[in-house]
Amino acid sequence: MRGSTESLCGTVPTDAAAERLVQSLIDVAGEDQVRTVLLFGSRLVQASPDRFSAYDFVLVVENYRAFYDALVRAGLSRRLPALQAVLNRLLAPNVVAFAPEGWNDVPVAKVMVLEPAALARALSRHAPDHFLKGRLVQRVALLHARDGAAVDWVTGLVTDARNDILRWAGPFLGESFTPAEVALRMLQVSYRGEVRPEAGDRVLDVFESQQPFLSDMLTCVLADAADAGELRLAGGNYQFVRAPSSRQRWSVRLYFARSKLRATARWLKHVVTFENWLDYIAYKVERRMGTRVEITTWERRLPYLLLWPKVVRVLRERPASSRTGAPR
């Protein structure tokens, strides 16, 4: 794919806080454990971040249990390492909080933890769901790689995932389309594949914050597809040489239905894996929706049993889009 390495390694703004967090991860886990660290999300693309926004990392470690043991030894986790490792294998990735300097007005990272094989599977054509693929085909930055082989490895995975966009976004495209239209549709489809406590027009914020990158990246993807004979140019727009079949459409819809179920299961798992998850998500709901959520002592003790009414209320009160093109 044209320009793939630049999309991971080039023109990343210096962020001292992110660098401190990455170095802390390496110090805690050990250089031999940390293969790569990727940054994505609002802190990278500047999609409505504020000083409370966590850094979104994808951390690739060589062994789950060794990593979680290291967090406990450093006093950065109170979770059982054995349980964390089991959950990570059952439904990757785990999402953990990493707050080496505390929680008050200092940098905090929200870390997706994967072993190498799990990341490779999550970004492949045979991914069990869209959770990681939908995020990492967007703009990402490679903050750390153990060596040159690690750079080549992760760059290849992300490049292959981007080259696969037309397979799962294609069934939702019109008869003809531009790179920018594919980029927006890709984000809309990805966001619909999850349960998110945000207004529908959040997808437009994400699109606009990284439109130059997405348009350039999709220009490369579509040009490669045209070279391969999958697309043709017609009046400045692209068209499929052979439109996605009904079978392909149903296969993709089934994939996203399964992905949404697995995403919902991850929300339940986050309560176990993520320190202060309930406070974090309550703040996120307030920041994105303007709805204050108070969590009682008993709801903290029995979240799976007692929090459902508030979850339903938040989803029901989620504001509809007020902007054209952002689906609910």
Where would I find each of the regions flagged by the language model?
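Short hydrophobic/aromatic beta-strand micro-patches
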Residues: 58-60
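Catalytic core of pol beta-like nucleotidyltransferases
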Residues: 1-32, 38, 44-51, 63-328
